[in-house]
Amino acid sequence: TPHVQGIMVEYPMVQARQCVVVSDAMPLDQAACVEPLAIALHAVARAGNLLGKRVFVSGAGPVGCLIAAVARLNGAASVAISDMEAFPLSVAVRLGADAAFKAADPALADLANGCEACFEASGSVGGMNTCLRSAAPGGTIVHVGFLGEEEVAYPINTMVIRKEVT
């Protein structure tokens, strides 16, 4: 099934084979969360044990907010999240994030080298770089966001030699 970018619209156009019939017994607001929650659960599982760990999430869309919630439910000591918009950050806080930062907030620098698990859910190169800066040495970065067809250069020396991130 091809990836569809930008599905957060009132009336998305998708192919019939991408649709699933939902029981009338399931409320639509819950049904709408199934797919992003599945992604969040998978991402958090990829990060390993989060008990007592500091977590950072770049991107407070549906997937990023649900990653924050699942990380909190999996015992993360703290969960910080960033986004370009204020409203999704407020949702993330309601779902369990301890700290929410606008992407341009200089306070994001305080996370540098301090998060044992980072999740890139914004689909942006800037978000990827913020995760890399925020990751503690030996930490884990789980890349969830879709960057489209753009070629991205990962700073391998920083990731492997200086930080030893996985």
Regions found by a protein language model. Name each.
Residues 109-118:
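A short acidic, Gly/Pro-enriched loop at the edge of an enzyme's catalytic core
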Residues 125-166:
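Glycine-rich phosphate-binding loop and adjacent beta-alpha segment
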Residues 102, 120, 143:
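Redox-cofactor binding/interface segments in oxidoreductases and associated redox assembly factors
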Residues 7-8, 84-91, 150-156:
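Short, glycine/polar-rich helix-capping loops at beta-to-alpha or helix-loop-helix junctions
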Residues 26-105:
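Mid-domain Rossmann-like dinucleotide-binding core that forms the NAD(H)/NADP(H) cofactor-binding site
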Residues 1-19:
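Glycine-rich phosphate/adenylate-binding loop and adjacent beta-alpha elements
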Residues 18-28, 113, 164:
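Glycine/charged-rich beta-loop-alpha catalytic/anionic-binding loops adjacent to active sites
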